[in-house]
From Swiss-Prot:
GO terms for biological process: anatomical structure formation involved in morphogenesis; animal organ morphogenesis; anterior/posterior axis specification; anterior/posterior pattern specification; axon guidance; canonical Wnt signaling pathway; cell-cell signaling; dorsal/ventral axis specification. It is found in: Secreted, Extracellular space, Extracellular matrix; Secreted. Disulfide bonds join 80-91, 131-139, 141-158, 206-220, 208-215, 284-315, 300-310, 314-354, 330-345, 332-342, 337-338. One of its GO terms (molecular function) is protein domain specific binding. This is Proto-oncogene Wnt-3. It comes from Mus musculus (Mouse). Some mouse mammary tumors induced by mouse mammary tumor virus (MMTV) contain a provirus integrated into a host cell region which has been named Wnt3. Residues 1-21 form the signal peptide. A lipid is attached at residue 212 (O-palmitoleoyl serine). Pfam families: wnt.
Length: 355
């Protein structure tokens, strides 16, 4: 590991006590192999770090679906890393830390908004899919078909019950967001935006039945989209996220913080928009306080004028170029019937990395 990254990682781990208060550390269950066996070992619920009492009760009462919750968080993290692969902050996780993103999400930034939304959506998505696959006895297919069949088709197959997946995500992910402060309000809003995206993207999927491929009978069912579509949509919402300001009100239970759109001339955010109220660091240099790993040694696109281009990704520091040899299949030929034969070629590529 490079010295500057080693120093940053040590700084993040040593500051762990402060970091843990920033966001749900139960997300770390996505990185633990032992949690895939939760369904057969209920006592593991007590070993999940960061669970509030309501989440612990949920885990023990609905132990069958907890592996899907873990899978959903993992799915959200993987999608975050895909969506931000060419950005200065690329959704880096720290495997041996309970705060898997480091201090980055301590602040109420756009990045925090996106991660909460995609993780919440991931839980809803994975639970819904697991129910449709029949891996749990407490859920299954959606028997409420949401309307009569259309002309030329009838209901069939297993409609995915996204309402149940959303309910699980809401009950579990929002359980800790019960404080009367601005950060809880922001987290709950963005969690719900992620879940709403799942519901909005449900679509009819159909299959034809008949002799010789004819479509004498067509059956349809409700299905979730590929999770990449959810990530793409929420990434667009990240780019257009609404900046908010914090307002304090005195109520019977004491002071309560709420969020209001910062710019009155703009359209206020809807339940489908992401919200934030603190500016992001520039992520150019390593910084243990902000959790930035910097962009040194990151691969950049020399032909791009976007954020993944060497000018922006490298923050004006310039870039290095090296050549790389790669073995690839080439000159492939299809043979009847039925296989493909290929030769192996050595190709030379230029690789550009930030200084």
């Amino acid at each position: 590991m490079e010295p500057h990254l080693l120093g940053l990682l040590l700084g993040l781990l040593l500051s762990g006590t402060r970091v843990l208060a920033g966001y749900p550390i139960w997300w770390s269950l996505a990185l633990g192999q032992q949690y895939t066996s939760l369904a057969s070992q209920p006592l593991l619920c007590g070993s999940i770090p960061g669970l509030v009492p309501k989440q612990l009760r949920f885990c023990r009462n609905y132990i069958e679906i907890m592996p899907s919750v873990a899978e959903g968080v993992k799915l959200g993290i993987q999608e975050c890393q895909h969506q931000f692969r060419g950005r200065r902050w690329n959704c880096t996780t720290i495997d041996d830390s309970l705060a898997i993103f480091g201090p980055v999400l301590d602040k109420a930034t756009r990045e925090s908004a996106f991660v909460h939304a995609i993780a919440s959506a991931g839980v809803a998505f994975a639970v819904t899919r697991s129910c449709a696959e029949g891996t749990s006895t407490i859920c299954g297919c959606d028997s409420h078909h949401k309307g009569p069949p259309g002309e030329g088709w009838k209901w069939g197959g297993c409609s995915e019950d996204a309402d149940f997946g959303v309910l699980v995500s809401r009950e579990f992910a929002d359980a800790r967001e019960n404080r009367p402060d601005a950060r809880s309000a922001m987290n709950k809003h963005n969690n719900e935006a992620g879940r709403t995206t799942i519901l909005d993207h449900m679509h009819l999927k159909c299959k034809c039945h008949g002799l010789s491929g004819s479509c004498e009978v067509k059956t349809c069912w409700w299905a979730q989209p590929d999770f990449r579509a959810i990530g793409d949509f929420l990434k667009d919402k990240y780019d257009s996220a609404s900046e908010m300001v914090v307002e304090k009100h005195r109520e019977s239970r004491g002071w309560v913080e709420t969020l209001r759109a910062k710019y009155a001339l703009f359209k206020p955010p809807t339940e489908r928009d992401l919200v934030y109220y603190e500016n992001s660091p520039n992520f150019c240099e390593p910084n243990p306080e902000t959790g930035s790993f910097g962009t040194r040694d990151r691969t950049c696109n020399v032909t791009s004028h976007g954020i993944d281009g060497c000018d922006l990704l490298c923050c004006g520091r310039g870039h290095n170029t090296r050549t790389e040899k790669r073995k690839e299949k080439c000159h492939c030929v299809f043979h009847w019937c039925c296989y493909v034969s290929c030769q192996e070629c050595i190709r030379i590529y230029d690789v550009h990395t930030c200084k």
